[in-house]
Amino acid sequence: DVECLASVQIETRQIAQMDSKDMDHATWFVLARAVLAACADEAVAGIVITHGTDTLEETAFFLSQLFTPSKPVVLTCAMRPATALSPDGPQNIVDALCVAANPSADGVWVVAAGAVHRPTQVAKVHPYRTDAFSSGETGPVGVVEEGRLRWLHPAGEKSFARSPSTAASRQIEGSSNLGTAANALLARLESNGLPRVEWVVSHAGVTPAAVTTCLMAGGEGGAVRGLVLVCTGNGTFHQCLTKPLRDAEACGVWLRRSTRCIQGSIVVGATSVD
């Protein structure tokens, strides 16, 4: 028996049944509406979302950037099938329910292998281990121990553990009716679609085609609106990409840099690129 769940009534609802590697924006929108409806229900204390591991971090990030819920919204998963000798799913679900039942856990979280992660920091870092998720240098913000949630940051630093506000979430938070504003935002996203953003990886032997092919491609997602350049080191990239990237920017394509390094982030300074 789990003490924190002794008086908890659990209701289930299936949003989709799919391999998470095939996650799409349409399913995100349906899920987001279900989360908003649950948040608006005064009888609901928290929400747990069971999700495949391959794109769990992306769904968590999407929800956290869409709005800041006033209740716990917890994503969890399983690395092993239910038929395994020692499945991890049941314990992960129990841990997620304990977090969702805790009123101090308002916001979006990822719970796996006893750890509580921020949606903006967590990533799947191993293809088969049960502790496949990591928040890198920042580490988890909390742990679940025998059904009890323990924050790893003092109460005064709780704000560090919460998702940062985006322009969209700030607009929604400022509304007198969060559900109405958030659903209106979702309606606009469904109507216009999310902007198409592609990744370009800088590597030894890369050619300008890595950029130009993305820009020429049409398809269901429409024209590319942004490129994320996955750089080497502290934001450096192959010189052959300079011209096509400048051409793309001149055409109104937004450019952002990230790094291939597993830890750390790009630091702007005398030795970094502009």
Identify the meaning behind each predicted range:
Residues 1-6, 118-234:
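Accessory alpha-helical/coil subdomains and C-terminal extensions
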Residues 29-42, 214-220:
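Short, well-structured alpha-helical segments in soluble
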Residues 75-153:
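Internal gly/pro-rich beta-alpha loop/helix module
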Residues 41-56, 221-234:
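Short acidic, glycine-rich surface-loop motifs adjacent to enzyme active sites
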Residues 229-274:
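C-terminal non-catalytic interaction/assembly regions of soluble proteins
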Residues 1-38, 263:
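ATP/NTP phosphate-donor binding region
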Residues 49-51, 74-77, 109-114, 201, ...:
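Short beta-strand segments
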Residues 49-71, 237-246:
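Short Gly/Thr/Asp-enriched flexible loops that form oxyanion-binding sites at enzyme active sites
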